[in-house]
C-alpha cells in the first residue's frame, strides 16, 4: 500500500522522533547536537520520490524547481507541499502543536497519514482530526525497534543469531564478556535498545576499551534496562530487506538491498544486492517467517530488517528491526529505474565542506562537468 499512488497520503518525515524513546538516565552518556534536528528536517524532500499527485507533503524548505523537474524522470508528479518553520523539534511535534494546519486540508479525500516513524504525537494528531493512520501503534513500533526484543524474537523462532548475551547489570556484562572471550572472541559489538545513525551501537576493539566502556555504562537498579554484547563479525556483508505487513496478515517482500556500513554507521545502499539465487530464496523464506511472527505480535506496516552474511556464507536473518520507513524505501523508484536499464545503483552519503552555499543548481553543474550527472 505504501507505494500505491491511487491512495491519497499525507507524508510526515519525522526523523529524530526516536530520541523520545531514549532514557537518558541509563546507557552511555551522549552529547546531542542541537542542530541535528534541523538537518533531519531538511532531509524531508526525499519523501517526494514516493508521492503521488493527490498527496500532501510537509517540508521545512521549498525544494528547488529544477530539482522537482529533474526527478519527474523517476515518476515524481507535482503534489501539494506545505512549508513549515524549521525548528529544533520534529515535524510531528510541530504539527501536534499546530493541528489547525491539518484542519485546512480537503476533507473530501480519504487521506492516509504516513509518518516516517509512527509516534505518539502522530497518533494524537490523527485521533483529534479523525485521520486514518498507516501502521500499528506507537507502543508496538517502540517494542519492535528495541534491539533486545529483536534478539529475543529470533531466539523464539530458533533462527541463526550472532553469538552474544543480554545484560542488565555491570556484573552480567562482565560475565558475558568473559564467556565470549572463552569462545575465542576478542572484538565485540555492544548495543543499547535504541539507536539512530550508529549512535547506541559501539564497536569494542580490545579488552582495554571494554573495561573503560563497562565503567561508563549505567544500568538501572531494578535491572529493567538491558543491553547486548555480541561477537564482532569481520568480513561480513550487510543485507537489508523490507517487508510490508498488511492488516490481514499478508507479508510482502518489497526489496532486498546491500548496505554500506562504516563500523557501525549506515552510509549507503547498493541495489540490487549481490546475492545468489539460493540466498534470495532464503531471504524470501525468512521474510515470511519473521513477518508472520511480527503480525502475531500485533505489528502492521513497513519494517526494514537488517541482516548479515558471515564469512562462511551463513545468513544471520535479523540483527535488528527498523519498524518504520527506511532511508532506502524512498530511493526504490530510483533503484528500480536503473535496474530496468540493467544498471546497478549505489546510493550513499558524503560529507562535504564548502565555503559557499551548495545548492542544487551548483551541484548539478559540478556533476555535469565531471560527466557523472544522469
PLM region spans:
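N-terminal "leader" segments that precede or initiate the main folded domain
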Residues: 1-72
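A short beta-strand motif that forms the metal-chelation/ATP-contact edge
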Residues: 241-243, 315-323
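Conserved ATP-binding module of the ATP-grasp superfamily
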Residues: 160-162, 183-189, 205-234
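A long amphipathic alpha-helix within ATP-dependent nucleotide-binding catalytic cores
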Residues: 231, 264-314, 352-374
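Conserved anion/nucleotide-ligand pocket segment
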Residues: 186-202
Amino acid at each position: 500500500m505504501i507505494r500505491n499512488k491511487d491512495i491519497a497520503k499525507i507524508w510526515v518525515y519525522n526523523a529524530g522522533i526516536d530520541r523520545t524513546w531514549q532514557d537518558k538516565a541509563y546507557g552511555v552518556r551522549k552529547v546531542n547536537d542541537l542542530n541535528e534536528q534541523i538537518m533531519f528536517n531538511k532531509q524531508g524532500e526525499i519523501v517526494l520520490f514516493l508521492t503521488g499527485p493527490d498527496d500532501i507533503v510537509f517540508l521545512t524548505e521549498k525544494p528547488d524547481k529544477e530539482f522537482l523537474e529533474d526527478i519527474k524522470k523517476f515518476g515524481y508528479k507535482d503534489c501539494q507541499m506545505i512549508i513549515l518553520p524549521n525548528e529544533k523539534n520534529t515535524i510531528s511535534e510541530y504539527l501536534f502543536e499546530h493541528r489547525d494546519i491539518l484542519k485546512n486540508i480537503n476533507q473530501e479525500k480519504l487521506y492516509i497519514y504516513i509518518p516516517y516513524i509512527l509516534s505518539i504525537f502522530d497518533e494524537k494528531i490523527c485521533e483529534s482530526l479523525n485521520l486514518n493512520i498507516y501502521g500499528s501503534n506507537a507502543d508496538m513500533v517502540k517494542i519492535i525497534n528495541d534491539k533486545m526484543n529483536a534478539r529475543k524474537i529470533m531466539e523464539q523462532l530458533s533462527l541463526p543469531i550472532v553469538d552474544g548475551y543480554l545484560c542488565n547489570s555491570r556484573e552480567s556484562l562482565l560475565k558475558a564478556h568473559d564467556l565470549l572471550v572463552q569462545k575465542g572472541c576478542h572484538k565485540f559489538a555492544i548495543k543499547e535498545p535504541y539507536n539512530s545513525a550508529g549512535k547506541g551501537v559501539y564497536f569494542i576493539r580490545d579488552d582495554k576499551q571494554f573495561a573503560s566502556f563497562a565503567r561508563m555504562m549505567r544500568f538501572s537498579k531494578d535491572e529493567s534496562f538491558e543491553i547486548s554484547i555480541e561477537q564482532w563479525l569481520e568480513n561480513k556483508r550487510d543485507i537489508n530487506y523490507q517487508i510490508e505487513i498488511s492488516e490481514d496478515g499478508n507479508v510482502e517482500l518489497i526489496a532486498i538491498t546491500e548496505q554500506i556500513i562504516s563500523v557501525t554507521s549506515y552510509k549507503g545502499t547498493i541495489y540490487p544486492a549481490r546475492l545468489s539465487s539460493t540466498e534470495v530464496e532464503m531471504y524470501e523464506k525468512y521474510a515470511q517467517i519473521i513477518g508472520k511472527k511480527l503480525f502475531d505480535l500485533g505489528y502492521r506496516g513497513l519494517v526494514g530488517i537488517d541482516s548479515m552474511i558471515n564469512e562462511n556464507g551463513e545468513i544471520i536473518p535479523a540483527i535488528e528491526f527498523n519498524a518504520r520507513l527506511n532511508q532506502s524505501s524512498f530511493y526504490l523508484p530510483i533503484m528500480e529505474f536503473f535496474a530496468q536499464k540493467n544498471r546497478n545503483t549505489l546510493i550513499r552519503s558524503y560529507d562535504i565542506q564548502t565555503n559557499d552555499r551548495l545548492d542544487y543548481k551548483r551541484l548539478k553543474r559540478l556533476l555535469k562537468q565531471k560527466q557523472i550527472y544522469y
